[in-house]
Every structure is written in structure tokens, then in C-alpha cells.
Regions:
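Peripheral terminal and inter-domain segments
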Residues: 199-297
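Acidic, surface-exposed loops and disordered segments
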Residues: 1-204
Length: 297
């Protein structure tokens, strides 16, 4: 599509279909974000598809490939010189670890591809000293913006984030956390339709006894920590930014009342175990996104 159309369509996507990416699509995204265009001075300098101060290019690209046609699921590193993938390890026993380091965000964990970028600061610092850290911070934004635009151009979507458990993410990628460490990540997939509240909630229920809701009280942990409490005859969801009353839809599902401090949350539902105890809570935002929070004993 024309460049201005791609710019205008650029958006953050956090819902993806189960469709796989093709090798050609992955190859295109990798080339657009870290591809080598020219090497000169006997390999001392490299021009890539993204700018870098002094052509130092301090970033490395790691990939979790969940669903790419023709490539086994696993963790890989992109090798720009030669435009190749280096297999690092299988993910057969890593799913729970991924859930933990990515804070249970299903839209990231289950995406067909997850880009992880690490930085090797010394590549820039030896030449530019203190200003290097400003340069590095700006350059990762350029790389991720290229991923946004390249994704839009081929009918994919992405949403970058710097929220993850730092030391465990470094361990997962196999970097030392000092000379090389994770700075950003972004899931990529085919955008899915917005999740509507009618698809999120089940049938309503009248005259729910508030006492039956006491079992839902407690702490829930995910991207952030939430509290659920009963007070003044109502159930409340409590955040660091404020609290919001939950209107009963049925015994496990609730619609939020308007509160500008936490306006993004539209509805909440709880998942129970066989004994009726809450195991997790799912939150629907006004953007049609859902986030999971595990019950904390």
C-alpha cells in the first residue's frame, strides 16, 4: 500500500487471530527492522534499514516463534549478516516460564511471533561515552516504529512494550543482564476483531446475594496488582490510581461503573475452581482487550 496509507493505518494491536505468519512475512519484518543494506571499511561499519549513531547498531533481535509456517516452534536469534535465523532452544518446557516473565499477558504469549530486542551498550559507549545512552534510547524507538509500519504494510499488527520481568527475561534469552540485556519486546500477528462486551459476558442473573461474592475478595496479580473488596454494600476493584464499583451481572461477572481514574476497564469476570474458589480474574478494556490476573493466596 502507499506509504501515507501505512502511516495513517499505524496502530497498536493487542488482539491477534490464530493465523500463522509465513517465512516470507517474517523475513520481511526482520529485514525492515535490522536488515543489512551495505557493509564497508572491511566490515567495520554496516548500514542497516534503521539509523544508528556512527553505524554502531548496538541491538540484537531474538524471536519466539510460535506459529511460522515451515519453522519449528522455538527461540531464535536473527543474524543480520546473511539474513539468517540461529536456533537457540525449544519451547516445549518454557510456556509457564514465558507466562511468568511476560506477566500473563495472553496477547503476547500466544502471538505467532514475539520480537525481543537486547542491547550491547559498549558498541556505542566506546565511541560516544555519556551521550550514548540517549542515542540508544532513541534508536530502539526507531527500530520498533519500523516494525509497526512494516507490519501494517503486510496486514499484520504489533504493540511494543517495556514491561516484563527484567532478570528472568534476560535469563530466558541467554544474555548476562550486564554487557547485554533486554530493552524492548513486541508481539506480531494478524489483527483480530475487537472483543465486544456481549462476547465477554454470559447471561445476566437477578438478585445475587452479596454474601456469595465474599469469596471473590483478595489480591490479583498480572501486569499490575489489583484488589477486590466489598465495602458499603458493593464490590469494588481497587487500583493504585483509584477504585471502581462493580455492578453485578451475575455471580462471577460484573460491569464497571464510570470512574475517570480507571476509565479503561469495561467489565470483569472471575474464573473459579471446582470448589468455587477464584483462580483468576479477566478484565475487558474499552479498547476490546482482555488481561488476566491470577488470584494471590
Amino acid at each position: 500500500p502507499p506509504f501515507l496509507e501505512v502511516i495513517n493505518k499505524r496502530a497498536s494491536h493487542r488482539r491477534f487471530t490464530k493465523a500463522s505468519l509465513t517465512i516470507e512475512e517474517l523475513s520481511f519484518l526482520l529485514w525492515c527492522t535490522q536488515g543489512v543494506k551495505r557493509v564497508f571499511k572491511n566490515g567495520f561499519m554496516t548500514f542497516k534499514t534503521v539509523p544508528s549513531a556512527g553505524a554502531r547498531h548496538p541491538f540484537e533481535t531474538y524471536l519466539v516463534l510460535n506459529r511460522v509456517k515451515g519453522i519449528n516452534r522455538g527461540l531464535y536469534r536473527y543474524v543480520p549478516h546473511g539474513h539468517k535465523l540461529l536456533f537457540i532452544k525449544s519451547l516445549e518446557s518454557e510456556f509457564e516460564n514465558l507466562e511468568k516473565i511476560l506477566l500473563n499477558r495472553a496477547h503476547i504469549i500466544n502471538a505467532p511471533v514475539i520480537f525481543f530486542w537486547t542491547v550491547v551498550p559498549y558498541r556505542t559507549v566506546w565511541k560516544y561515552k555519556n551521550p550514548s545512552y540517549k542515542m540508544i534510547s532513541i534508536e530502539i524507538g526507531m527500530i520498533c516504529q519500523n516494525l509497526y509500519l512494516a507490519s501494517e504494510a503486510i496486514g499484520c499488527g504489533t504493540c511494543g512494550t517495556e514491561i516484563y520481568i527484567q532478570d528472568q527475561t534476560d535469563d530466558f534469552l541467554g544474555v548476562d543482564g550486564e554487557d547485554e540485556f533486554t530493552v524492548f519486546l513486541a508481539p506480531v500477528g494478524k489483527p483480530a476483531a475487537k472483543l465486544e462486551i456481549t462476547n465477554f459476558l454470559s447471561n445476566p442473573q437477578n438478585n445475587v446475594d452479596l454474601n456469595k461474592l465474599k469469596k471473590l475478595e483478595g489480591k490479583y496479580s498480572g501486569v499490575i496488582e489489583l484488589d477486590i473488596k466489598i465495602k458499603d454494600g458493593s464490590l469494588f476493584l481497587i487500583l493504585s490510581s483509584g477504585e471502581i464499583a462493580l455492578k453485578i451481572h451475575n455471580e462471577t461477572e460484573f460491569i464497571t461503573e464510570w470512574n475517570p481514574a480507571v476509565w479503561q476497564i469495561l467489565a470483569v469476570k472471575f474464573l473459579l475452581d471446582d470448589e468455587g474458589r477464584p483462580t483468576s480474574m479477566e478484565v475487558l478494556t474499552i479498547n476490546g482487550l482482555s488481561f488476566s490476573f491470577n488470584s494471590v493466596e
